From Swiss-Prot:
It comes from Anthoceros angustus. This is NAD(P)H-quinone oxidoreductase chain 4, chloroplastic. The keyword Membrane applies. Belongs to the complex I subunit 4 family. It catalyses: a plastoquinone + NADH + (n+1) H(+)(in) = a plastoquinol + NAD(+) + n H(+)(out); a plastoquinone + NADPH + (n+1) H(+)(in) = a plastoquinol + NADP(+) + n H(+)(out). Keywords: Chloroplast, Membrane, NAD, NADP, Plastid, Plastoquinone, Quinone, Thylakoid, Translocase, Transmembrane, Transmembrane helix. InterPro entries: NADH_Q_OxRdtase_chain4, NADH_Q_OxRdtase_chainM/4, NADH_UbQ_OxRdtase, ND/Mrp_TM. Its EC number is 7.1.1.-. Pfam families: Proton_antipo_M. One of its GO terms (biological process) is ATP synthesis coupled electron transport. The gene is ndhD. GO terms for molecular function: NADH dehydrogenase (ubiquinone) activity; ubiquinone binding. NCBIfam families: NDH_I_M (TIGR01972), PRK12561.1 (NF009212).
Amino acid sequence: MSNFPWLTIIVLLPISAGLLIPLLPNKGNRIIRWYTLGICLVEFLLITYIFCNYFHFDNQFIELKEDYNWINLLDFHWRLGIDGLSIGLILLTGFITTLATLAAWPITRNPRLSYFLMLAMYSGQVGLFASQDILLFFFMWELELIPVYLLLSMWGGKRRLYAATKFILYTAGSSVFLLMGALTMGLYGSDGPTLDFENLANRSYPIGLEIILYLGFFIAYAVKLPMVPLHTWLPDTHGEAHYSTCMLLAGILLKMGGYGLIRINMELLSHAHSIFAPWLVVIGAIQIVYSALTSLSQLNLKRRIAYSSVSHMGFVLIGIGSTTDIGVNGAILQMISHGLIGAALFFSAGVTYDRTRTLFLNQMGGIATSIPKIFTMFSSFSMASLALPGLSGFVAELMIFLGIVSSQNFSFLFKVVIIIVAATGIILTPIYLLSMLRQMFYGYRIIKNLTSYVTDAGPREIFIFICLFFPIIGIGFYPKLVLSLSNSKVESIISGNFSSK
């Protein structure tokens, strides 16, 4: 226990420090870069300190809970806390954001605003995962929108305004359902309004209302996850955004949807979740295959990786829909694993673009000998993405399959069909990833005289590569590093709300 407001500090520190960026000396970008990187490092060290000193692996309850009165009318409090669902994603947020800040160093146009927006995203993401108030959860959810929109529209590619507008329309439009659901849950009942997750977990709703609430929240999460057919904003966004922004999107932003499904839909609306769980599994299986096939047809490198992300998030839907301990833990592991792998792939694509000045696979070829270090790391991360044994993706997908097999909520025929469909997606994954590597690095060199003006990865880029690769290997060989964080909490959710384990 601690009376010190640790969580409030880690939520407010990045955005508060970002407000000081305009006061820094205007002597090039060096001071701004190091200042922002220093803030990110301090934040990540604080998160690590909190994890090491105040998080207990066998505790299923909220720890370090902070509750400060904010708006009395709606019982709107500044409520924060950590548990097994949130701590892993908070650590992932700190890790990926720090590396994304380092990856953004080549940005030279208006770096003050760029780094401030990244720090604002940092606060919003940590705040969302630490929120214990449903309206505060919505507030942090919305805090992401403007920074991403500006990062995309100001530092994106040729079609950046189209992609940014599409992003804001999809995400802001779906957020209306999140707000309506949050207010309805908070105001429902005769015992007065409450927005506290702990109190909401003890409330019951008429099944019709619970289904409506579930669907409202689900629409918001389906856009962020993203879920087919609400996914079309993601390839456009990734295709136009700077690769440091892509790292934040793939590494953290998509995980907000999966986290919301577990935190609110599964934990607070368990009866409705039991009804819709088979549909989550079906949609997840279809998404895996559809996105894999679509990825195979993409000539743009970043769009191919984006569709790969959509495909991999289909496994998260299947794991959450399985309503089993091993399946839900597998979904959480998949979110963290993909957060690392997705960020790594987009960084690899970005540094490759910095050298070739093209993202189109049919304009590359034979560049492996010119950039062997980038080739090695790009290939390694692609192997992780196709779930090679010994790397993090393999364990997560295996657990999700075991979750479906062990579930008592589905018929044998249903399980067989889902496994066959999902396995088809797994077969397609190495096809589109290996063909991507072949088109980029092997064959005839299309870009002439590449070696005369291109250098391989430098110290900064190699450092980012190594920092991303070690956790992928570590989780692959010892997945208990992540599973021990969420196991107790997931077990309490399943045993308390669902009959099948």
